[in-house]
Amino acid sequence: MKKTKLLNASLSHYIATLGHTDSLVICDAGLPISNQVERVDLALEAGVPGFLQTVDVVISEMFVEHAVVAKEIREKNPQIHDALLDSLRKLSEQQGNCIAVEYVEHEEFKVLSSESKAAVRTGEFSPYANIILYSGVPF
């Protein structure tokens, strides 16, 4: 049995197969996921698992180079936004790199998400709780 945080086999597989600049989406329960993107559906019920909890587990195993979020999160979901930025700041310190965060309109976010290797659907029921994480290399 694995001894790291991430126990979900499918999600662990997708993270392990990411190459430089490949992306992974972590999204709330309502984001439309393209049929061309592999889906890892973790949602059990409203709020379970939560978006931030899922992000923290994923970034414990993924080297992140940069991230994309919808502009709307700043106004419509400031608590999630601030906690997300805090998690990314801590990850930057751990990894020894600067993780750039790009803000785009939600409609553009949906287009970009359709280019990801996989999308992780959480049980999050708050608006714009979505992020695209782009894989970097730890060297």
From Swiss-Prot:
Binding residues for substrate: D28, H106, Y128, A129, N130
Keyword Heme carried by entry: no
Transmembrane domains' residue ranges: none
Keywords linked to the UniProt accession: Carbohydrate metabolism, Cytoplasm, Isomerase
One Pfam family recorded for the sequence: RbsD_FucU
InterPro entries: D-ribose_pyranase (IPR023064), RbsD-like_sf (IPR023750), RbsD_FucU (IPR007721)
GO molecular function ontology, one term from the record: D-ribose pyranase activity
Chemical reaction(s) catalysed: beta-D-ribopyranose = beta-D-ribofuranose
Pathway noted in the entry: Carbohydrate metabolism; D-ribose degradation; D-ribose 5-phosphate from beta-D-ribopyranose: step 1/2
SUPFAM superfamilies reported in the protein's UniProt record: RbsD-like
Subcellular localization(s) per the UniProt record: Cytoplasm
Protein's GO biological process: D-ribose catabolic process
Major place of residence: cytoplasm
Protein name per UniProt: D-ribose pyranase
